[in-house]
Amino acid sequence: MHPLDYIINSLGCNIIELDENSLEKKYIKDFLINTGANSYSIKNIFKITESRNDIFFNPYNFDKRYIFFHGTKPENILGILSEGLKISPVQAKFSGKRFGDGIYLSDSYEISIVYSKKDKDKKDKKYILLVEAALGEKNKDYITHDCEIEKEHTFITEEGYRILKIPCNSKRNGIIVVKNAMNVRVKYIIEV
């Protein structure tokens, strides 16, 4: 067995490169551009399916599920894919805890890309995750940007989760802190 195949098999998920002409990739690119990614070149988008972590997702059956960004370093991606996102993992470098321990997500590409460092081997590449978060009631003390999401501003995927279609030039800067790791799962890896 090739070593790369061994690593991919050990992750416990499938990684599928989205076709350049797929509608799914178009919606994701539009979402990225409308949330601040227009200064970055989107090189590739990978969809994560059949993750062994999916069986633990959303144990409280929250009906509000949204897509958010999560910036991370390239060296963290394999661990995230195999074990899921963690609340303040021991091996992670400290990058701020403005709202305490939790998984920090954002509705803004511009905020999340700051936490994504360049690949050491390929100096021009960064990675950002699109994650699905199952949310219960919001804690108003922690909300920096709150608005009602109208139905016409969302795209429902085949899997039933919502992708926000943010109007052009809309400024988003919300930080969402999820306190339970089982309420978050990785759906896409974006290479920029």
Positions of the model-derived regions?
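Active-site and NAD+-binding cores of ADP-ribose-processing enzymes
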Residues: M1, L78, I87-Q91, S116-V192
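Eukaryotic beta-rich interaction modules
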Residues: K47-S51, L81-V90
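Extended catalytic/binding region for NAD+/ADP-ribose chemistry, centered on the ART fold
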Residues: F68-E75, P89-D121, V131
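Intrinsically disordered, low-complexity regulatory regions enriched in Ser/Pro/Gly/Thr
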Residues: N38-S39, P59-D63, S95-F99, L105, ...
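Short, solvent-exposed polar/charged micro-motifs at secondary-structure junctions
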Residues: R52-N58, G79-L81, N139-I143
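Intrinsically disordered, low-complexity terminal and linker regions
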Residues: M1-N76, I176-V192
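Ordered, helix-dominated protein-protein interaction surfaces in large eukaryotic regulatory proteins
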Residues: Y6, D30, K47, G71, ...
